[in-house]
Protein backbone atom coordinates (compact mmCIF):
# COMPACT_ATOMS: atom_id res chain seq x y z
CA UNK A 1 0.00 0.00 0.00
CA UNK A 2 2.91 2.37 0.76
CA UNK A 3 4.28 1.93 -2.73
CA UNK A 4 0.88 2.60 -4.36
CA UNK A 5 0.27 5.79 -2.33
CA UNK A 6 3.70 7.10 -3.23
CA UNK A 7 3.10 6.57 -6.94
CA UNK A 8 -0.41 8.10 -6.75
CA UNK A 9 1.00 11.16 -5.01
CA UNK A 10 3.58 11.62 -7.73
CA UNK A 11 0.85 11.46 -10.39
CA UNK A 12 -1.17 14.21 -8.64
CA UNK A 13 1.88 16.39 -8.16
CA UNK A 14 2.85 16.16 -11.81
CA UNK A 15 -0.73 16.87 -12.87
CA UNK A 16 -0.80 20.14 -10.86
CA UNK A 17 2.47 21.30 -12.38
CA UNK A 18 1.72 20.37 -16.00
CA UNK A 19 1.30 24.03 -17.04
CA UNK A 20 4.73 24.96 -15.69
CA UNK A 21 6.58 22.07 -17.24
CA UNK A 22 5.91 18.95 -19.26
CA UNK A 23 8.71 17.07 -17.60
CA UNK A 24 9.86 16.11 -14.12
CA UNK A 25 13.53 16.92 -13.68
CA UNK A 26 14.00 14.37 -10.90
CA UNK A 27 12.42 11.35 -12.52
CA UNK A 28 12.92 12.42 -16.16
CA UNK A 29 9.33 11.42 -16.97
CA UNK A 30 7.19 13.20 -19.58
CA UNK A 31 3.70 11.89 -18.83
CA UNK A 32 1.61 10.37 -16.08
CA UNK A 33 1.35 7.19 -18.14
CA UNK A 34 5.09 6.79 -17.91
CA UNK A 35 4.81 7.21 -14.14
CA UNK A 36 2.20 4.44 -14.09
CA UNK A 37 4.57 2.20 -16.04
CA UNK A 38 7.36 3.03 -13.63
CA UNK A 39 5.07 2.30 -10.69
CA UNK A 40 4.13 -1.09 -12.12
CA UNK A 41 7.81 -1.82 -12.64
CA UNK A 42 8.50 -0.68 -9.10
CA UNK A 43 5.77 -2.98 -7.76
CA UNK A 44 7.15 -5.91 -9.76
CA UNK A 45 10.68 -5.27 -8.51
CA UNK A 46 9.49 -4.91 -4.90
CA UNK A 47 7.55 -8.16 -5.10
CA UNK A 48 10.54 -9.94 -6.60
CA UNK A 49 12.85 -8.63 -3.87
CA UNK A 50 10.33 -9.58 -1.20
CA UNK A 51 10.06 -13.11 -2.62
CA UNK A 52 13.83 -13.40 -2.71
CA UNK A 53 14.14 -12.29 0.91
CA UNK A 54 11.43 -14.70 2.05
CA UNK A 55 13.11 -17.52 0.15
CA UNK A 56 16.44 -16.61 1.72
CA UNK A 57 14.96 -16.62 5.21
CA UNK A 58 13.38 -20.02 4.68
CA UNK A 59 16.12 -21.83 2.82
CA UNK A 60 19.34 -19.77 3.05
CA UNK A 61 20.60 -21.25 -0.20
CA UNK A 62 23.58 -19.30 -1.57
CA UNK A 63 23.85 -18.41 -5.23
CA UNK A 64 25.95 -20.63 -7.44
CA UNK A 65 27.63 -17.60 -8.99
CA UNK A 66 31.22 -17.32 -7.81
CA UNK A 67 32.45 -13.91 -6.70
CA UNK A 68 36.00 -12.75 -6.14
CA UNK A 69 37.19 -11.70 -2.72
CA UNK A 70 38.61 -8.19 -2.57
CA UNK A 71 41.97 -9.19 -1.05
CA UNK A 72 44.38 -9.14 -4.06
CA UNK A 73 46.44 -12.10 -2.85
CA UNK A 74 43.36 -14.21 -2.12
CA UNK A 75 41.84 -13.28 -5.48
CA UNK A 76 44.99 -14.40 -7.29
CA UNK A 77 45.04 -17.68 -5.34
CA UNK A 78 41.40 -18.42 -6.16
CA UNK A 79 41.99 -17.67 -9.84
CA UNK A 80 44.93 -20.08 -9.77
CA UNK A 81 42.72 -22.72 -8.16
CA UNK A 82 40.04 -22.28 -10.83
CA UNK A 83 42.62 -22.50 -13.64
CA UNK A 84 44.13 -25.57 -12.03
CA UNK A 85 40.69 -27.18 -11.82
CA UNK A 86 40.30 -27.06 -15.60
CA UNK A 87 43.54 -28.95 -16.21
CA UNK A 88 43.67 -32.72 -16.45
CA UNK A 89 45.84 -34.29 -13.77
CA UNK A 90 47.45 -37.68 -14.48
CA UNK A 91 46.48 -40.46 -12.11
CA UNK A 92 48.89 -40.84 -9.20
CA UNK A 93 49.19 -43.65 -6.66
CA UNK A 94 51.08 -41.37 -4.28
CA UNK A 95 52.77 -37.97 -4.15
CA UNK A 96 55.83 -36.47 -2.50
CA UNK A 97 55.66 -33.33 -0.31
CA UNK A 98 57.59 -31.39 -2.96
CA UNK A 99 54.76 -31.97 -5.49
CA UNK A 100 52.47 -29.65 -3.54
CA UNK A 101 54.98 -26.98 -2.55
CA UNK A 102 53.64 -23.56 -3.57
CA UNK A 103 54.88 -20.02 -2.99
CA UNK A 104 53.47 -16.55 -3.46
CA UNK A 105 55.39 -13.29 -3.07
CA UNK A 106 54.38 -9.99 -1.53
CA UNK A 107 56.17 -7.42 -3.68
CA UNK A 108 55.86 -4.57 -1.22
CA UNK A 109 58.85 -2.67 -2.59
CA UNK A 110 57.46 -2.31 -6.11
CA UNK A 111 53.69 -2.47 -5.50
CA UNK A 112 52.44 0.57 -3.60
CA UNK A 113 48.80 -0.58 -3.74
CA UNK A 114 49.70 -3.92 -2.15
CA UNK A 115 51.79 -2.19 0.49
CA UNK A 116 48.90 0.11 1.42
CA UNK A 117 46.47 -2.82 1.56
CA UNK A 118 48.62 -4.72 4.06
CA UNK A 119 49.88 -1.89 6.26
CA UNK A 120 48.66 -1.71 9.86
CA UNK A 121 48.52 1.51 11.93
CA UNK A 122 51.87 0.49 13.43
CA UNK A 123 53.53 0.11 10.03
CA UNK A 124 53.71 -3.70 10.21
CA UNK A 125 51.86 -6.30 8.14
CA UNK A 126 48.18 -6.60 9.02
CA UNK A 127 48.04 -10.00 10.66
CA UNK A 128 44.33 -10.39 9.94
CA UNK A 129 45.02 -10.25 6.19
CA UNK A 130 47.91 -12.68 6.65
CA UNK A 131 45.44 -15.15 8.19
CA UNK A 132 43.24 -14.85 5.10
CA UNK A 133 46.20 -15.54 2.82
CA UNK A 134 47.37 -18.52 4.86
CA UNK A 135 43.97 -20.19 4.58
CA UNK A 136 43.64 -19.39 0.87
CA UNK A 137 47.07 -20.76 -0.07
CA UNK A 138 46.59 -23.82 2.14
CA UNK A 139 43.36 -24.49 0.24
CA UNK A 140 45.20 -24.28 -3.08
CA UNK A 141 47.82 -26.72 -1.85
CA UNK A 142 45.15 -29.14 -0.62
CA UNK A 143 43.35 -29.07 -3.99
CA UNK A 144 46.64 -29.64 -5.81
CA UNK A 145 47.43 -32.69 -3.68
CA UNK A 146 44.10 -34.45 -4.20
CA UNK A 147 43.96 -33.78 -7.96
CA UNK A 148 44.28 -36.90 -10.10
CA UNK A 149 43.48 -39.42 -7.36
CA UNK A 150 40.27 -41.23 -6.44
CA UNK A 151 36.92 -39.48 -6.70
CA UNK A 152 36.61 -36.55 -9.07
CA UNK A 153 33.92 -34.92 -6.95
CA UNK A 154 35.00 -34.08 -3.44
CA UNK A 155 34.94 -31.06 -1.16
CA UNK A 156 37.89 -29.93 0.93
CA UNK A 157 37.12 -28.15 4.19
CA UNK A 158 39.40 -26.53 6.75
CA UNK A 159 39.00 -28.73 9.82
CA UNK A 160 41.42 -27.00 12.19
CA UNK A 161 44.43 -24.77 12.58
CA UNK A 162 46.72 -26.30 15.20
CA UNK A 163 48.96 -23.33 15.87
CA UNK A 164 50.39 -20.32 14.10
CA UNK A 165 53.55 -19.17 15.86
CA UNK A 166 55.33 -15.89 15.16
CA UNK A 167 58.88 -14.73 15.72
CA UNK A 168 57.86 -11.19 14.80
CA UNK A 169 55.62 -9.26 12.44
CA UNK A 170 57.82 -7.40 9.94
CA UNK A 171 57.49 -3.85 8.71
CA UNK A 172 56.70 -3.40 5.02
CA UNK A 173 60.17 -2.34 3.91
CA UNK A 174 61.09 -5.68 2.33
CA UNK A 175 59.29 -8.21 0.14
CA UNK A 176 57.91 -11.33 1.81
CA UNK A 177 57.32 -14.89 0.59
CA UNK A 178 54.45 -17.12 1.70
CA UNK A 179 55.02 -20.83 1.10
CA UNK A 180 53.45 -24.13 2.05
CA UNK A 181 53.33 -27.84 1.34
CA UNK A 182 51.59 -31.01 2.49
CA UNK A 183 53.57 -32.59 5.34
CA UNK A 184 51.27 -35.39 6.54
CA UNK A 185 48.34 -37.33 5.04
CA UNK A 186 45.99 -39.68 6.83
CA UNK A 187 43.11 -41.53 5.23
CA UNK A 188 40.92 -38.54 4.40
CA UNK A 189 42.79 -35.67 6.06
CA UNK A 190 46.02 -33.83 5.41
CA UNK A 191 48.24 -31.45 7.33
CA UNK A 192 49.75 -28.47 5.51
CA UNK A 193 52.69 -26.50 6.89
CA UNK A 194 52.64 -22.79 6.08
CA UNK A 195 55.62 -20.44 6.46
CA UNK A 196 56.50 -16.82 5.70
CA UNK A 197 60.00 -15.39 5.40
CA UNK A 198 61.55 -12.16 4.27
CA UNK A 199 63.01 -12.08 0.77
CA UNK A 200 66.63 -11.03 0.37
CA UNK A 201 69.29 -11.23 -2.30
CA UNK A 202 70.84 -14.41 -0.95
CA UNK A 203 67.64 -16.48 -0.66
CA UNK A 204 69.01 -18.92 -3.25
CA UNK A 205 72.30 -19.40 -1.40
CA UNK A 206 71.03 -20.34 2.05
CA UNK A 207 67.86 -21.52 3.71
CA UNK A 208 65.89 -18.43 4.83
CA UNK A 209 64.66 -18.11 8.40
CA UNK A 210 60.89 -17.88 8.55
CA UNK A 211 59.12 -15.51 10.94
CA UNK A 212 55.79 -17.36 10.87
CA UNK A 213 54.89 -21.04 10.89
CA UNK A 214 51.48 -22.66 11.11
CA UNK A 215 49.75 -25.98 10.43
CA UNK A 216 46.37 -26.29 8.70
CA UNK A 217 44.32 -29.50 8.66
CA UNK A 218 42.01 -30.17 5.71
CA UNK A 219 39.48 -32.99 5.38
CA UNK A 220 38.10 -34.36 2.10
CA UNK A 221 34.39 -35.21 2.08
CA UNK A 222 31.82 -36.20 -0.49
CA UNK A 223 29.71 -33.06 -1.18
CA UNK A 224 26.48 -35.07 -1.37
CA UNK A 225 26.87 -37.52 1.54
CA UNK A 226 29.31 -35.42 3.61
CA UNK A 227 31.25 -38.61 4.36
CA UNK A 228 35.07 -38.72 4.38
CA UNK A 229 36.80 -39.53 1.10
CA UNK A 230 40.14 -41.30 0.79
CA UNK A 231 42.87 -39.05 -0.62
CA UNK A 232 46.25 -39.54 -2.25
CA UNK A 233 48.91 -40.96 0.12
CA UNK A 234 52.05 -38.95 0.88
CA UNK A 235 55.53 -40.48 0.64
CA UNK A 236 58.28 -38.34 2.24
CA UNK A 237 61.70 -38.48 0.56
CA UNK A 238 64.20 -36.40 2.53
CA UNK A 239 65.12 -36.77 6.20
CA UNK A 240 63.43 -33.45 7.00
CA UNK A 241 60.23 -34.52 5.24
CA UNK A 242 60.24 -37.81 7.16
CA UNK A 243 60.73 -36.01 10.49
CA UNK A 244 57.86 -33.59 9.84
CA UNK A 245 55.68 -36.48 8.62
CA UNK A 246 56.37 -38.39 11.83
CA UNK A 247 55.49 -35.34 13.93
CA UNK A 248 52.21 -35.00 12.03
CA UNK A 249 51.47 -38.66 12.67
CA UNK A 250 52.11 -38.23 16.40
CA UNK A 251 49.84 -35.18 16.57
CA UNK A 252 47.06 -37.01 14.72
CA UNK A 253 47.36 -39.98 17.09
CA UNK A 254 47.31 -37.68 20.14
CA UNK A 255 44.12 -35.98 18.92
CA UNK A 256 42.47 -39.33 18.31
CA UNK A 257 43.45 -40.60 21.76
CA UNK A 258 42.18 -37.41 23.41
CA UNK A 259 38.80 -37.82 21.71
CA UNK A 260 38.54 -41.42 22.93
CA UNK A 261 39.52 -40.55 26.51
CA UNK A 262 37.11 -37.64 26.63
CA UNK A 263 39.77 -35.07 27.55
CA UNK A 264 38.42 -31.60 27.04
CA UNK A 265 34.71 -32.41 27.25
CA UNK A 266 34.28 -31.86 30.98
CA UNK A 267 34.10 -35.58 31.90
CA UNK A 268 36.76 -36.55 34.47
CA UNK A 269 37.43 -40.06 33.17
CA UNK A 270 41.22 -40.17 33.61
CA UNK A 271 43.82 -39.24 36.21
CA UNK A 272 44.74 -36.20 34.14
CA UNK A 273 41.10 -35.09 34.01
CA UNK A 274 40.80 -35.47 37.79
CA UNK A 275 43.82 -33.20 38.28
CA UNK A 276 42.25 -30.69 35.91
CA UNK A 277 39.03 -30.76 37.94
CA UNK A 278 40.99 -30.05 41.12
CA UNK A 279 42.74 -27.15 39.43
CA UNK A 280 39.38 -25.74 38.32
CA UNK A 281 38.06 -25.88 41.88
CA UNK A 282 41.13 -23.96 43.06
CA UNK A 283 40.40 -21.24 40.50
CA UNK A 284 36.87 -20.96 41.87
CA UNK A 285 38.27 -20.57 45.39
CA UNK A 286 40.44 -17.70 44.11
CA UNK A 287 37.40 -16.09 42.48
CA UNK A 288 35.17 -16.36 45.59
CA UNK A 289 35.95 -12.87 46.99
CA UNK A 290 35.16 -11.25 43.62
CA UNK A 291 31.86 -13.12 43.46
CA UNK A 292 30.69 -12.76 47.07
CA UNK A 293 32.72 -9.95 48.69
CA UNK A 294 33.89 -7.67 45.86
CA UNK A 295 34.84 -4.79 48.20
CA UNK A 296 37.37 -7.06 49.90
CA UNK A 297 38.65 -8.77 46.75
CA UNK A 298 42.10 -8.43 45.25
CA UNK A 299 42.09 -5.15 43.25
CA UNK A 300 44.49 -6.73 40.76
CA UNK A 301 41.96 -9.45 39.84
CA UNK A 302 38.91 -9.26 37.58
CA UNK A 303 36.13 -11.65 36.61
CA UNK A 304 36.20 -13.08 33.11
CA UNK A 305 32.70 -11.77 32.37
CA UNK A 306 33.96 -8.19 32.69
CA UNK A 307 36.44 -8.66 29.83
CA UNK A 308 33.83 -9.60 27.22
CA UNK A 309 33.38 -7.85 23.87
CA UNK A 310 30.97 -8.63 21.04
CA UNK A 311 30.09 -7.71 17.47
CA UNK A 312 27.67 -8.96 14.82
CA UNK A 313 27.56 -9.05 11.04
CA UNK A 314 25.65 -10.53 8.11
CA UNK A 315 27.69 -12.97 6.01
CA UNK A 316 27.92 -11.32 2.59
CA UNK A 317 28.33 -13.14 -0.77
CA UNK A 318 31.54 -11.21 -1.55
CA UNK A 319 33.42 -13.30 1.03
CA UNK A 320 32.36 -16.80 0.00
CA UNK A 321 34.77 -19.43 -1.23
CA UNK A 322 34.60 -21.80 -4.18
CA UNK A 323 32.36 -24.17 -2.19
CA UNK A 324 29.79 -21.38 -1.74
CA UNK A 325 30.52 -21.15 1.98
CA UNK A 326 31.97 -18.18 3.83
CA UNK A 327 35.74 -18.07 3.40
CA UNK A 328 37.42 -19.44 6.54
CA UNK A 329 40.24 -16.92 6.32
CA UNK A 330 37.72 -14.08 6.50
CA UNK A 331 36.26 -15.50 9.72
CA UNK A 332 39.76 -15.80 11.16
CA UNK A 333 40.48 -12.16 10.34
CA UNK A 334 37.26 -10.92 11.95
CA UNK A 335 37.93 -13.03 15.05
CA UNK A 336 41.51 -11.78 15.30
CA UNK A 337 40.48 -8.13 15.01
CA UNK A 338 37.93 -8.54 17.82
CA UNK A 339 40.50 -10.39 19.95
CA UNK A 340 43.02 -7.61 19.38
CA UNK A 341 40.47 -4.99 20.46
CA UNK A 342 39.57 -7.03 23.56
CA UNK A 343 43.22 -7.35 24.56
CA UNK A 344 43.86 -3.65 23.90
CA UNK A 345 40.91 -2.72 26.11
CA UNK A 346 41.99 -5.14 28.84
CA UNK A 347 45.72 -4.42 28.89
CA UNK A 348 45.61 -0.68 28.43
CA UNK A 349 48.29 -0.61 25.73
CA UNK A 350 48.77 -1.66 22.10
CA UNK A 351 49.28 -5.45 22.34
CA UNK A 352 51.54 -7.51 20.14
CA UNK A 353 50.48 -10.78 18.57
CA UNK A 354 52.33 -13.84 19.80
CA UNK A 355 50.48 -16.79 18.29
CA UNK A 356 47.19 -18.24 17.17
CA UNK A 357 46.82 -21.01 19.70
CA UNK A 358 44.01 -23.10 18.26
CA UNK A 359 41.14 -22.80 15.80
CA UNK A 360 38.35 -25.32 15.36
CA UNK A 361 35.79 -25.25 12.54
CA UNK A 362 32.69 -26.98 13.84
CA UNK A 363 30.19 -26.00 11.15
CA UNK A 364 30.24 -24.07 7.85
CA UNK A 365 28.82 -20.57 7.51
CA UNK A 366 26.40 -19.80 4.67
CA UNK A 367 25.81 -16.57 2.80
CA UNK A 368 23.18 -14.51 4.63
CA UNK A 369 23.84 -16.02 8.05
CA UNK A 370 23.74 -13.67 11.02
CA UNK A 371 27.07 -14.05 12.81
CA UNK A 372 27.82 -13.08 16.39
CA UNK A 373 31.44 -12.94 17.56
CA UNK A 374 31.96 -13.10 21.34
CA UNK A 375 35.40 -12.53 22.86
CA UNK A 376 36.78 -12.64 26.39
CA UNK A 377 40.08 -12.93 28.19
CA UNK A 378 40.01 -16.59 29.14
CA UNK A 379 43.07 -16.23 31.36
CA UNK A 380 46.13 -14.06 31.84
CA UNK A 381 49.66 -14.55 33.14
CA UNK A 382 50.49 -11.23 34.84
CA UNK A 383 54.19 -12.05 35.26
CA UNK A 384 54.53 -14.17 32.13
CA UNK A 385 54.61 -17.43 34.11
CA UNK A 386 56.30 -20.55 32.77
CA UNK A 387 55.13 -19.80 29.23
CA UNK A 388 56.34 -16.21 29.43
CA UNK A 389 59.84 -17.39 30.29
CA UNK A 390 60.16 -18.49 26.67
CA UNK A 391 59.37 -15.05 25.27
CA UNK A 392 62.68 -14.01 23.77
CA UNK A 393 64.46 -11.18 25.66
CA UNK A 394 61.33 -10.39 27.69
CA UNK A 395 60.87 -13.24 30.20
CA UNK A 396 58.63 -11.29 32.59
CA UNK A 397 56.15 -9.62 30.23
CA UNK A 398 52.46 -10.38 30.86
CA UNK A 399 50.62 -12.69 28.47
CA UNK A 400 46.92 -12.47 27.64
CA UNK A 401 44.92 -15.38 26.18
CA UNK A 402 41.76 -14.43 24.28
CA UNK A 403 38.94 -16.78 23.28
CA UNK A 404 36.61 -15.83 20.43
CA UNK A 405 33.49 -17.81 19.63
CA UNK A 406 31.53 -17.37 16.41
CA UNK A 407 27.82 -18.25 16.53
CA UNK A 408 25.38 -18.55 13.65
CA UNK A 409 22.21 -16.88 14.90
CA UNK A 410 18.78 -18.05 13.70
CA UNK A 411 16.25 -15.47 14.93
CA UNK A 412 13.36 -17.18 13.12
CA UNK A 413 13.56 -20.13 15.51
CA UNK A 414 15.40 -18.42 18.40
CA UNK A 415 18.47 -20.64 18.11
CA UNK A 416 22.23 -20.15 17.90
CA UNK A 417 24.82 -22.70 16.75
CA UNK A 418 28.54 -22.56 17.52
CA UNK A 419 30.42 -22.40 14.23
CA UNK A 420 34.00 -21.62 15.19
CA UNK A 421 36.17 -21.21 18.26
CA UNK A 422 39.45 -19.28 18.13
CA UNK A 423 42.28 -18.78 20.64
CA UNK A 424 44.85 -16.00 20.43
CA UNK A 425 47.82 -15.15 22.66
CA UNK A 426 49.07 -11.58 23.00
CA UNK A 427 51.92 -10.02 24.95
CA UNK A 428 51.89 -6.59 26.60
CA UNK A 429 55.37 -5.35 25.60
CA UNK A 430 55.91 -2.47 28.04
CA UNK A 431 53.73 -3.51 30.98
CA UNK A 432 55.29 -5.11 34.05
CA UNK A 433 52.06 -6.81 35.03
CA UNK A 434 48.32 -6.98 34.32
CA UNK A 435 45.17 -7.97 36.17
CA UNK A 436 44.58 -11.64 36.86
CA UNK A 437 41.43 -12.96 35.16
CA UNK A 438 39.30 -15.43 37.12
CA UNK A 439 36.25 -17.50 36.07
CA UNK A 440 32.80 -16.79 37.42
CA UNK A 441 31.47 -20.36 37.30
CA UNK A 442 32.79 -23.90 37.62
CA UNK A 443 32.02 -24.51 33.94
CA UNK A 444 34.17 -21.53 32.97
CA UNK A 445 36.89 -22.70 35.36
CA UNK A 446 37.01 -26.09 33.63
CA UNK A 447 37.38 -24.45 30.24
CA UNK A 448 40.19 -22.24 31.56
CA UNK A 449 42.06 -25.25 32.91
CA UNK A 450 41.59 -27.14 29.65
CA UNK A 451 43.06 -24.19 27.75
CA UNK A 452 45.96 -23.85 30.21
CA UNK A 453 46.68 -27.55 29.94
CA UNK A 454 46.66 -27.42 26.13
CA UNK A 455 48.96 -24.38 26.10
CA UNK A 456 51.44 -25.99 28.47
CA UNK A 457 51.55 -29.15 26.36
CA UNK A 458 52.06 -27.15 23.18
CA UNK A 459 54.82 -25.11 24.82
CA UNK A 460 56.63 -28.33 25.68
CA UNK A 461 56.09 -29.77 22.19
CA UNK A 462 57.32 -26.67 20.42
CA UNK A 463 60.06 -25.61 22.84
CA UNK A 464 62.89 -23.97 20.97
CA UNK A 465 60.59 -22.31 18.46
CA UNK A 466 57.16 -21.55 19.88
CA UNK A 467 56.92 -18.33 21.86
CA UNK A 468 60.31 -17.04 20.74
CA UNK A 469 58.98 -13.64 19.88
CA UNK A 470 61.44 -10.80 19.37
CA UNK A 471 59.54 -7.77 20.66
CA UNK A 472 62.43 -5.42 19.90
CA UNK A 473 62.04 -6.08 16.16
CA UNK A 474 58.77 -4.13 16.00
Predicted regions: what they are:
Residues 151-177, 202, 348-364, 369, ...:
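A cross-kingdom feature marking solvent-exposed beta-strand/loop segments within repeated
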Residues 259-304:
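Extended repeat-based solenoid scaffolds, especially LRR ectodomains
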Residues 125-151, 327-349:
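Active-site helix/loop of acyl-thioester processing domains in fatty-acid/polyketide metabolism
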Residues 43-85, 168-174, 183-269, 367, ...:
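HotDog/MaoC-like acyl-thioester-processing domains
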Residues 1-64:
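N-terminal mitochondrial targeting presequence
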Residues 99-111, 305-316:
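Short amphipathic
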Residues 309-360:
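Eukaryotic modular interaction domains in large regulatory/scaffold proteins
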Amino acid sequence: MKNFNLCRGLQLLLSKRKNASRSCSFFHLRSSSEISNKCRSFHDTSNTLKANVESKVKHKQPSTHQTKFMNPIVRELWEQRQRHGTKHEPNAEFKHPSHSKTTIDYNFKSNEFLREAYQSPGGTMRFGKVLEDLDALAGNIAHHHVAGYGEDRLMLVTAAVDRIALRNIPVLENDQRLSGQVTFVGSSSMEIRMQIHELSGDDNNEKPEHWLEGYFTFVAVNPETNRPVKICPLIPKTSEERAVFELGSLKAAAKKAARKKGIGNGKPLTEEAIKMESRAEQLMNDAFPLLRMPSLADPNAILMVHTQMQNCMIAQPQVRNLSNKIFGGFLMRRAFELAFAACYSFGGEWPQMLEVDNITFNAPVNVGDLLQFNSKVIYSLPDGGDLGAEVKKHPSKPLVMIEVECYVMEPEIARANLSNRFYFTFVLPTKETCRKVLPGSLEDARRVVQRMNADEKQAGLGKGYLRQYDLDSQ
